[in-house]
């Protein structure tokens, strides 16, 4: 889908979690992070359910924070838009987009202040992606002009964007309006129990 939603990485993390569960391995075992790191830089992130701060190449867990409350969100992507993650990082390395130091958002996450944390959301790689694919910027501008959005930004390297919303109804209405614009859109929510095993009933 080339959306920046971490599809392959979440699939890999899901397999690791499922195998750990099946083999009776504690999910807190650092060996699982090492295995995940060998697959891809962002796979370790998806092994953990709570917000976290990673260092190094983005694959070394430094700090985990308390889970945030369930929050309505809408995902929006121009149907034909795509961004090469490799190219986005290459351009970022050539001309890095500045970003605020993480101290303020880390403090908000540590105290569980979702409102402040969401207000500080920033994706400096998304700046590059929007330059590469102008339709991303069109979606961002549209989302930011809508009532009820709490935070708007690019998902990963794009081409999907998200808007955290003040209510589930807002997310649903925005998804419907985005679809009327010809974009792919989906209303959902951020949840705190993202890493879990759901075995089929026998």
Where are these regions (language model features)?
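Short pre-catalytic strand/loop immediately N-terminal to key active-site residues, enriched for Gly-Thr
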Residues: 1-4, 149-152
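DPxDG-like acidic metal-binding loop motif
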Residues: 3-31, 45
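Phosphate-handling active-site elements
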Residues: 18-39, 167-178
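Conserved, helical-rich catalytic subdomain that frames metal- and/or nucleotide-binding sites
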Residues: 48-151, 166-169, 176, 187-202
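Short hydrophobic/aromatic beta-strand micro-patches
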Residues: 162-164
């Amino acid at each position: 889908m080339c959306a920046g939603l971490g599809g392959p990485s979440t699939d890999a993390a899901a397999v690791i979690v499922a195998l750990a569960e099946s083999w009776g391995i504690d999910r807190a075992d650092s060996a699982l992070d090492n295995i995940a790191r060998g697959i891809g830089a962002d796979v370790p992130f998806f092994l953990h359910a709570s917000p976290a701060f990673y260092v190094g190449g983005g694959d070394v867990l430094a700090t985990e924070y308390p889970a945030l409350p369930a929050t309505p969100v809408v995902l929006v992507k121009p149907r034909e838009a795509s961004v090469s993650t490799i190219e986005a990082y290459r351009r970022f390395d050539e001309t890095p987009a500045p970003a605020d130091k993480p101290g303020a958002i880390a403090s908000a996450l540590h105290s569980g202040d979702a409102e402040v944390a969401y207000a500080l959301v920033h994706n400096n790689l998304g700046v590059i992606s929007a330059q590469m694919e102008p339709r991303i910027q069109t979606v961002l501008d549209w989302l930011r002009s809508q009532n009820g959005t709490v935070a708007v930004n690019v998902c990963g390297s794009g081409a999907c964007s998200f808007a955290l919303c003040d209510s589930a109804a807002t997310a649903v209405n925005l998804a419907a309006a985005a679809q009327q614009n010809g974009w792919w859109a989906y209303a959902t929510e951020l949840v705190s129990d993202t890493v879990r095993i759901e075995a089929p009933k026998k």
